[in-house]
Amino acid sequence: MVASTKYEVAAQNEADEADGSAQGDGAGPAAEQVKLKKEISLLNGVCLIVGNMIGSGIFVSPKGVLMYSASFGLSLVIWAVGGIFSVFGALCYAELGTTIKKSGASYAYILEAFGGFLAFIRLWTSLLIIEPTSQAVIAITFANYMVQPLFPSCGAPYAAGRLLAAACICLLTFINCAYVKWGTLVQDIFTYAKVLALIAVIIAGIVRLGQGATTNFEDSFEGSSFAMGDIALALYSALFSYSGWDTLNYVTEEIRNPERNLPLSIGISMPIVTIIYLLTNVAYYSVLDIKDILASDAVAVTFADQIFGIFNWTIPLAVALSCFGGLNASIVAASRLLFVGSREGHLPDAICMIHVERFTPVPSLLFNGILALVYLCVEDIFQLINYYSFSYWFFVGLSIVGQLYLRWKEPDRPRPLKLSLFFPIVFCLCTIFLVAVPLYSDTINSLIGIGIALSGLPFYFLIIRVPEHKRPLCLRRIVASTTRYLQIICMSVAAEMDLEDGELPKQGPKSK
């Protein structure tokens, strides 16, 4: 679907432009390349990771972890294990991101290691379930926390929440279409806000501990449930809060000096989030007992009601702001995934085009926004989350298997960051556990998730694998017309790919 002429090595482009300038009137320098610009700094990278990881989870998930662990002590151990597991995964992705300098995270890594088929299934699953569902859920959570205070004695109107969620998605899509720097600025501001809110919770907890409120920590492991099923479900709840550590790998091509800033951003972000999560839970436990936490739908709000007095409204606001920042990071990541998928020929060409003046992937952002808006129309949207746990962890694990495979297949490949094999092997073993658990404990939803992934098979073999000249003429005309009009409306052209390692992009069957 993507012609090989779309991608030219940057040096060749510059040479052609230089020749043109020499033959012209010498009025100015060669035209600037139309491609994604490297505008994400180290600070932006840290804020993207922290901002996406700290969503609504830490304000809500403590209930799920405590429900299955059944004790404060074991729940803190689960939170620590979840943090260590996420650090292992993030370190593996740091090596992959500095070795394979493409945006798209696991999609790009699976494509490089195993070819187009598995990569397309990964993309198809994200397209149908993972990305639009998660964005719709985050937007609805944001809207609920913003609207509910206006209706203290009753439930907020359904339409009001959905309209506000739609407005949130549209606003953030517009911001990211306008300028990359606008999107990173929004991310930075809202990351600072949510971290400050959690610091306020932590300080309040420390004050209570200083006043002698240590009753809940006496015999903290009493009543613990060590059943493997309960441990697994508690770990799932914790990992929900830690999800997002791979955010920066979706925008690798836009990071300044990725060999340095990608692993450094991960190395800074992961300890920050893990420490904040542990201290926040300690703060919760210093005020609330097990019964209070299990009876609460939003632990942080219950905590604020008992501690902050007339300022208890600050925590629902903090949850809303946290969701807003998390949604922004999710939109950035998902749009780049669609962009790279189109560039590799797995989605229509128009999606990998870039605005000629703003250098933002406007078509992929709009496509992602439309998908999220469509999923807002699903009344029981939260049910869809249950369908992708299996698929998500399967493809994350497959990426790390690809890392091990590339170590064996290409041992001499340059790797700016090279980990001990201990990290990917341990992570793969843990991922097998995370994939097996939902198959056993939530078989129906897991099978539905597998079915959704496999529904991409006809599309792949009947369209993607078929050479363009053999596709129906009517289909080619529709695609060509749509691409042309979208280029005009979005002021976008095909992106040039700047390959720093000098390798030509892979074309043909493997990338198809």
Curated annotation (Swiss-Prot):
The keyword Transmembrane helix applies. GO terms for cellular component: basolateral plasma membrane. It holds the Pfam family AA_permease_2. InterPro entries: AA/rel_permease1 (IPR002293), AminoAcid_Transporter (IPR050598). GO terms for molecular function: basic amino acid transmembrane transporter activity; L-amino acid transmembrane transporter activity; L-arginine transmembrane transporter activity. This is Y+L amino acid transporter 1. The keyword Transport applies. Heterodimer with SLC3A2, that functions as an antiporter which operates as an efflux route by exporting cationic amino acids from inside the cells in exchange with neutral amino acids plus sodium ions and may participate in nitric oxide synthesis via the transport of L-arginine. Also mediates L-arginine transport in non-polarized cells, such as monocytes, and is essential for the correct function of these cells. The transport mechanism is electroneutral and operates with a stoichiometry of 1:1. In vitro, Na(+) and Li(+), but also H(+), are cotransported with the neutral amino acids. Its main location: membrane.
